């Protein structure tokens, strides 16, 4: 069974509460999402492998540590996942970026893929899939299944909010993929939105309706 990691740092919880407010502007919502993704990135990357290298300081030679292996790949589930990227890149500026375009059929709530573009050498890379909301879990599960066809070294999933239903879907479909979230909310409504949630993350990031 995959592990659910709740990132409950006080700054994360503070900013998340401010983002949830219906009166939060597009600008403030977008800014706080970037700040949150930076904070969450520290937790998610704490187990990245390291290797020793010899370097010269201004005073002497020493052995230091750097991230081992190929660059991390951040995979955004379009379009809302893009809101995470700038904040994540503050922490891992050398990361490669992939995109998966999925939309949720309003009748079946099942994902339909319309775009898929990844960096090269995926089999040598660790992957972090990002999407602000883990609602039904169908889109996240479909994205991970598609990525597994490329045989990456590992896959993690990061979201801002999760519903219990979405967590259950992901854990059943992909028990090997850890989930990182700032909160697990109460439930989904009849339309597949998270309650109490924060509304449609994509609309709030981009100022659309």
UniProtKB/Swiss-Prot annotation:
> Which principal EC class is assigned to this enzyme?
transferase
Where does the chain bind uracil?
194, 199-201
GO BP term, pick one: uracil salvage
The free-text cofactor remark is:
Binds 1 Mg(2+) ion per subunit. The magnesium is bound as Mg-PRPP.
SUPFAM superfamilies assigned: PRTase-like
Q: Which InterPro entries match?
A: PRibTrfase_dom, PRTase-like, Upp_B, UPRTase/APRTase, Ura_phspho_trans
Alphabetically sorted, this entry's keywords are:
Allosteric enzyme, Glycosyltransferase, GTP-binding, Magnesium, Nucleotide-binding, Transferase
Q: List the disulfide bonds.
A: none
Q: Which reaction does it catalyse?
A: UMP + diphosphate = 5-phospho-alpha-D-ribose 1-diphosphate + uracil
Which top-rank group of organisms is this from?
Bacteria
Extract one GO molecular function annotation from the record. Answer: uracil phosphoribosyltransferase activity
Cofactor(s) the record lists:
Mg(2+)
Binding of 5-phospho-alpha-D-ribose 1-diphosphate, residues: 79, 104, 131-139, 200
Gene3D superfamilies per UniProt: 3.40.50.2020
Question: What is stated about the way this protein's activity is regulated?
Answer: Allosterically activated by GTP.
Tell me its EC number(s), please: 2.4.2.9
Q: What family name appears in the similarity comment?
A: Belongs to the UPRTase family.
PANTHER family membership? ADENINE PHOSPHORIBOSYLTRANSFERASE, URACIL PHOSPHORIBOSYLTRANSFERASE, CHLOROPLASTIC
Q: Which HAMAP family match?
A: Upp_B (MF_01218_B)
What is this protein for, i.e. what is its function?
Catalyzes the conversion of uracil and 5-phospho-alpha-D-ribose 1-diphosphate (PRPP) to UMP and diphosphate.
Q: What is this protein called?
A: Uracil phosphoribosyltransferase
Query: To which species is this protein native?
Result: Delftia acidovorans (strain DSM 14801 / SPH-1)
Kindly list the organism's lineage: Bacteria, Pseudomonadati, Pseudomonadota, Betaproteobacteria, Burkholderiales
Its gene?
upp
């Amino acid at each position: 069974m995959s592990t659910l990691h709740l990132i409950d740092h006080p700054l994360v919880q503070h900013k998340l509460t401010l983002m949830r407010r219906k009166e939060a502007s597009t600008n403030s919502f977008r800014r706080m999402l970037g700040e949150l993704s930076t904070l969450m990135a520290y937790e998610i990357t704490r187990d990245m492998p390291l290797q020793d290298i010899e370097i010269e300081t201004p005073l002497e030679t020493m052995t230091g540590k750097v991230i081992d292996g190929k660059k991390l790949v951040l995979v955004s589930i379009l379009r809302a996942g893009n809101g995470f990227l700038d904040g994540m890149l503050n922490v891992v500026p050398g990361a490669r970026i992939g995109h998966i375009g999925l939309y949720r059929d309003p009748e079946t709530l099942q994902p339909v893929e319309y775009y898929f573009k990844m960096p090269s050498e995926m089999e040598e890379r660790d992957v972090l899939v990002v999407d602000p909301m883990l609602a039904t879990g169908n889109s996240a599960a479909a994205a991970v299944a598609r990525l597994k066809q490329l045989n990456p070294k590992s896959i993690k999933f990061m979201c801002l909010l999760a519903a219990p239903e979405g967590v259950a879907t992901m854990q059943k479909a992909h028990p090997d993929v850890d989930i990182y979230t700032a909160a697990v909310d109460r439930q989904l409504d009849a339309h597949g939105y998270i309650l109490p949630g924060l509304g449609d993350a994509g609309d709030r990031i981009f100022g659309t309706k």
